[in-house]
């Protein structure tokens, strides 16, 4: 019939991708609110990464498989560059085909939580000449052991990937009451406050943004020296409440580049969150330990040099002394029988609120100064 002479093998990736997106577009956008990462962004990210035919590549939120396809295309283009006459020379073909096909079959991995989208990703890969073998349906945030147990695919092992390229879902919150794995994430715990006077117990956060947890999950999957290219909302990079996330990124990765994407980057898909691409290289375990140790040393020096704990203890004593004195005054003036009774009066409560507010401001000013000194010392 009409389709008999058609050959998709020779069709370029962009044409196939455009056809697939047109065919599947309403399915993704309408039914699931999922969005394709624009091809221009996918191509840019894959082009700048030094992916080779023996590299092991993963997308932990693979959606329709765009990043995996462009990685495959990059390796296939390299094969064609090395063996340009593969179509007419059988000896070249014997090298050309396994060069990229082994990569597609053994080195490309994708995780997608939605089963129907995962199937669509596999179909997309098949249309583009395979690579679907290691695309699985799973929550991308469960442990590698859980993934291996559920899928019997031993390729999904922590510490084995050379490249992770991903655009994780933004804005969703994982609640610790819903997912037991929250407690296994460093970024699922409340950060340690080095300026706290008393030792703090380790506390699990009530919830954490999915994109933040994916940073840690991707770190776990990478080899030492492996590269992570991840699209993140700018809130992770700029919000003061996210400083602990940026600190953790510094501990785990060498920051290669941060590329700001235009506000309109995802507008064609109906998403308008300002975002950036982070290119990160995983430190060795020793380097991470060295960085953390240096930070602890700076903290220790600053605490000692500023007599921080002694000052805080002195202020606490001063508060208690003033509280006792005020309660005594009220007790005598109003003829109260006890100090606790005096502390229940409206006069004492108003006065005490002002006192605590004044000291809280002093503490905040001291902490701000110490934090600034810490940042300056860290940059030296």
Task: Name each model-derived stretch.
Residues 1-26:
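Long recognition/docking surfaces used for binding and targeting
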Residues 3-7, 23, 49, 168, ...:
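Generic structural signal for hydrophobic core residues of well-folded globular domains
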Residues 5, 29-30, 57, 103-108, ...:
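Glycine- and acidic
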Residues 9-13, 35-39, 208:
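Conserved phosphate/pyrophosphate-binding and hydrolysis machinery centered on Walker-type P-loop NTPases
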Residues 26, 30-35:
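Nucleic-acid modification enzymes, centered on SAM-dependent nucleic-acid methyltransferases
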Residues 34-166, 171-175, 182, 188, ...:
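Conserved S-adenosyl-L-methionine
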Residues 142-143, 149-152, 156-380:
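A conserved structural/catalytic subdomain of Rossmann-like adenosyl-cofactor enzymes
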